Amino acid sequence: MRFQEKLHQYSKEEIWEEYCGFLTLSSAEFMNIQNRLLLEQMELWSSSGLGQSILKGKQPRTISEFREMVPLTTYEDYAPTLLAKQVGSLPGDPVLWVQTTWEGGVHPIKVAPYTKAMLDTFKHNVMSCLILSTSQKKGEFDVNVTDHMLYALAPMPFVTGLLPLLFKDEIDIEFLPSVRDAVKMTFKERNVQ
């Protein structure tokens, strides 16, 4: 169900709980969730070619073992695999790749794969941010299908270019200028008119 349908079918309190309920978690509850998510990611990463290139055959089973076995890494450690977009070495199949500049790096850009699961989580988080950005207090927010938003974003393949795509899946908020027009304009052109 799209977010805009939830606006008509659920109370603001129910929507708040779904998207912003994490704000009321205790520290222990929050850490339990984070540890579970870290274990899930650790298992996926450890069994991938990319993970094994760092682990050198080791298989950590706990977060403590992972911390002991895995050295601190930087993007430089992953660059050969990611820049070549070696999908077979990744923990999951990417749906798309985003990029950013690489200040101080050997190459001019960094690229990062996004899987369907990552995009779904990102979309949920974007909607949470939209709710929080329009709220005055817990359970109250001001999001409507008729809202307009300034397109002051770098377009795809930069990660900010995902925002209009993710919004489109959830709510018919209009961007000004329209996404179709904005992606053809320079940053200056988008923000001067």
Residue ranges and their predicted role:
Residues M1-Q193:
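Nucleotide 5′-phosphate-binding alpha/beta core
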